[in-house]
């Protein structure tokens, strides 16, 4: 953002919501924003080049995360990713008959809360646990909400509005103890 010489440059503190790209990421992405923009699902030469680059990126991300490339799904952003994770896990569990319970907090990103609202209308059990006055998940309330039918627990690592950092190690321990089959989404 350009600023007149006599004005202070603003300091943007909401890095939990968006963060400037690292120079290496800009360099790796720029060719696909400025020229090599083929549809990776197509069959022509430009599309095949885009698909090769996409699959190469998938392998790099998979290696960094210690998973297989087939486990890496790229989305357009956080909202789409939250919807996919929460709804996908819930519907997969229901189709496998492993449970129908979803646990989240009242302090989650709206993409998670709206996904939970939709799933609740579709017959899933949704528990929305409280947070402390400091914005930290109430671990006792979380523990009470977990049971053997819980299939996904969603607790955001860092709140994008006030910056509280959740105790995910403690959350994960509770999930392992009380709902061992549940996925932890953050």
What is each PLM-predicted segment?
Residues 1-186:
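Pyridoxal 5′-phosphate
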